[in-house]
């Protein structure tokens, strides 16, 4: 029932307005959530999705933030939180026959990675 007042040292990195639907990014994020830094890099290297490269860069950025800002080693961080939130839609129109225009919605999302050191 008591609350734990220990403050966890965590490093975070986020990509905002990433031009991909949230569902496609979640497909990749769900595979790496809770894994170690090395395991996540190996998984992302061999997954065939377009979101993998951006998430790989984001994980590398979070590890660099942990190393530079908090002094944590790169040997044993793991991904404690990984989330994808929907963002705004970019609305465009595709010209069609006889003066019509069809709406095109280009979805974006926000990706956030939080890493802590595994003890």
Swiss-Prot record:
InterPro entries: Ribosomal_uL22, Ribosomal_uL22_bac/chlpt-type, Ribosomal_uL22_bac/org-type, Ribosomal_uL22_CS, Ribosomal_uL22_sf. It is found in: Plastid, Chloroplast. SUPFAM superfamilies: Ribosomal protein L22. It comes from the Eukaryota. PROSITE patterns: RIBOSOMAL_L22. Pfam families: Ribosomal_L22. GO terms for biological process: translation. Belongs to the universal ribosomal protein uL22 family. This is Large ribosomal subunit protein uL22c.
């Amino acid at each position: 029932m008591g609350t734990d007042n220990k403050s966890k040292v965590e490093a975070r990195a986020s990509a905002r307005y990433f031009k991909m639907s949230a569902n496609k990014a979640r497909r990749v994020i769900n595979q790496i959530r809770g894994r170690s830094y090395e395991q996540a890099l190996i998984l992302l290297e061999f997954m065939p999705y377009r979101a993998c490269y951006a998430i790989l860069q984001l994980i590398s950025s979070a590890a660099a933030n942990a190393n530079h800002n908090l002094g944590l080693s790169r040997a044993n961080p793991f991904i404690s939180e990984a989330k994808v939130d929907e963002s705004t839609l970019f609305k465009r129109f595709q010209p069609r026959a006889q003066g019509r225009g069809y709406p095109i919605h280009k979805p974006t999302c926000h990706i956030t990675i939080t890493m802590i050191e595994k003890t």
